[in-house]
Amino acid sequence: MEAERLNAIAQQLDDLRARGRELRRYLDYDEKSSKLEEVTRALEDPAVWNNAEKAQELGKEKRQLEDVVHNLRDIESLSSDLKDLFDLAEAEDDEDTLAAVEADIGELQAKVHALEFRRMFSNPMDPNPCFIEIQAGAGGTEAQDWAGMLERMYLRYCERKGFNVELMEESEGEVAGIKGATIKVSGDYAYGFLRTETGIHRLVRKSPFDSNARRHTSFSSVFVYPEVDDSIQIDINPADLRIDTYRASGAGGQHINKTDSAVRITHEPTGVVVQCQNDRSQHKNKAEAMSMLKARLYELELRKRQSEQQKLEDSKSDIGWGHQIRSYVLDQSRIKDLRTNFEVGNTQAVLDGDLDDFIAASLKQGV
């Protein structure tokens, strides 16, 4: 076996073990491990199920603790096993064992990288589910088609990440695409992964809707906000609400268009508007819309506390059309994030949901 190859593998293993130790320190492994035992014991007590809300909170906390503790244990165990195998391969000059070690290093690197990525989730709401609102800008069919492309991009991204998605409401475009849509995303750190997508997305392309194939520029806004659980108190005065019902405009079969099951709620003091049409039951749609409103009002208050430069005035204009975050220039095969200057040339991959590098760059820079 070549000494250079052995040294490279040994260095990789030492580096990964050191990163694993740093993660245990940074993520408070000992404290989280003790807390996991405590929560597990609490859930084993039959009396806890007398309070369904408390049991649900404990179950959620247990899953979050297990995610960290079990992954840290896996990293330590795999690191130790690979070190032992490497020492054996080196001592016995065993090429097959050494090749197996090299193959498994990739798995260890992926586990370490995934936990290191978590260190960038600094927002206390990052572990929560979230909502993605997409709104077409001015420009008619071209802008609406672009909004539809963004909706598809985020659905594909969520599929890649293993997130669960639910289309809360969708307004179809007049010719193609959509005028707007709201998607609920559930999964570990859904909000953390998606929150930096908030802003204006700009598309430049030769329009398929222009008979002269001229270059068109279109804009769509994306707004991501976290779902707020019941432990956070958001007081909503019923007198401040205007509740409208209407017939759903999106796809949903014959039944959905025969009844006024869709619900739109306007919070008069702030101008925040939410709507839901994903269920045939008006009652369920209203409950979901109230949950969305609570999340929006929480995000509004959070931004006020953080003294950000702009208040959220309503559900569509809260971002400001000048706040462009990413430019998609398709005929030049270039997509560039204007905040981080990260750029790629494979435009189709991005539109198919390959957003990891853009999201990682924005989280690293804290945008």
From Swiss-Prot:
Gene behind this protein: prfB
Positions carrying N5-methylglutamine: Q254
Classification via HAMAP family: Rel_fac_2
Function, as annotated: Peptide chain release factor 2 directs the termination of translation in response to the peptide chain termination codons UGA and UAA.
GO cellular component, one term: cytoplasm
Primary localization: cytoplasm
GO MF assignments: translation release factor activity, codon specific
PANTHER family per UniProt: CLASS I PEPTIDE CHAIN RELEASE FACTOR (PTHR43116:SF3), PEPTIDE CHAIN RELEASE FACTOR 2 (PTHR43116)
Compartments (UniProt record): Cytoplasm
InterPro entries referenced in this protein's UniProt entry, alphabetically: PCRF, Pep_chain_release_fac_I, Pep_chain_release_fac_I_sf, PrfB
Descriptive protein name: Peptide chain release factor 2
Entry comment on modification after translation: Methylated by PrmC. Methylation increases the termination efficiency of RF2.
Family: Belongs to the prokaryotic/mitochondrial release factor family.
PROSITE patterns: RF_PROK_I
Matching Pfam families: PCRF (PF03462), RF-1 (PF00472)
Keywords: Cytoplasm, Methylation, Protein biosynthesis
